[in-house]
Amino acid sequence: MSIVIFGDDFAFPEGDAATNRIHTYAKGFIENGIHVHVICFANVYNADTAGSINGINYYHPFGERTRSKFLIIRTWHKFTKHFKTFSLLLRIHKSDPVMAINSWTQSLTCQLYIYLLARLIRIRLVSERSEHPLRKYQGSSSRIMVGEIKSYLGSKLCDGILCISQYLIEFYAARGIKRKKLFLVPSTVDTDRFKIKTESPLQYDYILYCGTLTILKDGVDILIKSFAILSKRFPDIQLVLIGKANTLENDTLLKRLVSDLHLSDRVVFTGQISRNEVPSYLTNAKILALARPASIVAEAGFPSKLTEYLSTGIPIVVTAVGEIPVYLKDGSNAFLCEPDNPEIFAEKLLFVLDNYSNALDIARNGQKLTETTFNYRFQAKRIEEFIKTL
């Protein structure tokens, strides 16, 4: 028995937050006795067309290593991957019966494609929803209407929907989607990755942010401004930013901000690092920080980086946006503050540094959540049971 994780909204085995969530799903399914096949449907030029990691079989049906200079050939490659995927899915189902497909896509055409395949092969289809469906359709009423229509149609082209937040459950329920089709799966984390304490990769104390360097979504600019406030009181602490910016514009803005605040020798941009390197950076940080601003993205989602932060037992300073306050309480298992305010965020960072022994005790309380609510094995079993009800 197996589960296929399919989509064009992630890379694998290396990638971003979606990739990490898929790794946790897959590990949980495998430990519960279910085989996992990951099909990356994106048009990505990759040296590996297929492989296996930690018992997870993965495939890239696009299958091209280099980009052709001819448009007709590129179009042909994009077209033929649909037949390759169909053939691949049939082979998997024949040798390792598929109980369900878990789809990860924001494209209505891609969702329609996998829906038709699932119906043809008679496999249940469960969609993943980790972000606000209308986040890219803000502005005019016509844009919002287009987003609403696409969201509604996409939600009809599946048997079930896994929602990362209660907000998304209510969003779809308010639009006529039956509640029995909706299932809450909060952020998940593989705690085993963070249990082994390794030597610090850096030779100094540091506050750390790990993730895509975004301004509107994760407020990296706010974090930099907050660090500027505390940097004079703590001259031996650096700010380390792991990841790359989502746009060239954001990359330029963030690096210019660091320069303008005279922090070039205090803020470290590591760039993208491998998934295996992340735990050593997180577990050796002084503080793990996330200054996420209030936004439509924050309202509906829950940052996967936060559950990774929690699993380390390192003090966390985070803004109280979206459903973060549902799970975390200021001074109980993390340190929360209001969003969009560098001064207040800096005050909370300073408080943790000034009361570090107590902060470690609070961090250990937060760590307990990763053994229960956010535990990958527990949530994978819940997903399996939900699929059986469809």
Identify the role of each PLM range:
Residues V4, L162, S200-D218, I224-F227, ...:
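Conserved donor-binding/catalytic core segment of Leloir-type glycosyltransferases
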Residues T109, I121-R124, H132-L157, T191:
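Nucleotide-sugar donor phosphate/pyrophosphate-binding loop at the beta->alpha transition
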Residues Y167, T188:
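Carbohydrate-associated surface elements
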Residues R266, L282-A300, I314:
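Acidic donor-binding loop of glycosyltransferase active sites
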Residues I287-L290, E308-S311, P315-V318, F335:
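Short hydrophobic beta-strand element within catalytic cores of glycosyltransferases
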Residues D330-G331, F335-P342, F351-S357:
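Conserved acidic donor-binding segment of nucleotide-sugar-dependent glycosyltransferases
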